[in-house]
């Protein structure tokens, strides 16, 4: 079994694309394939010591799911399936996609929701990311002046995505016992 579980929720496929770009940097022994949370059981998800989790922020700051007009189930439906699990001793890194121009008041709020969910259940969340280079008004994904994970805006800053992903993976690798 791979050491790191890589899971995402997606509506348009952008988060899936980023997850697949992350997976390409690791072999199968190190990281699982990128798997949509609507295709994983709670048991399979919970078996990983290390998790990299991705989410877009939809509408006015919502997690993807049926109530936010997604065509398929996503984080909104998956989180209740794992809410009773204890994530103590697990290390989680988050990446989020959002639109800082179209939704500056709640940029990456869904990533903030995932952060709260996993920290409340004992997980150690790593991979805080600087807010420098972003222009937004508010975000629940900012704690102590930094994003709680990798912040991506494919709508307005797509040219910075590859560089940001590479820098973030280098930052979190030691937390997962890896070197890049």
From Swiss-Prot:
This is Flavodoxin B. It comes from the Bacteria. Belongs to the flavodoxin family. Gene3D superfamilies: 3.40.50.360. It comes from Azotobacter chroococcum mcd 1. Keywords: Electron transport, Flavoprotein, FMN, Nitrogen fixation, Transport. Its cofactor is FMN. Low-potential electron donor to a number of redox enzymes. NifF is the electron donor to nitrogenase. The keyword Flavoprotein applies. GO terms for molecular function: electron transfer activity; FMN binding; oxidoreductase activity, acting on NAD(P)H, quinone or similar compound as acceptor. It holds the Pfam family Flavodoxin_1. Residues 4-173 form the Flavodoxin-like domain. One of its GO terms (biological process) is nitrogen fixation.
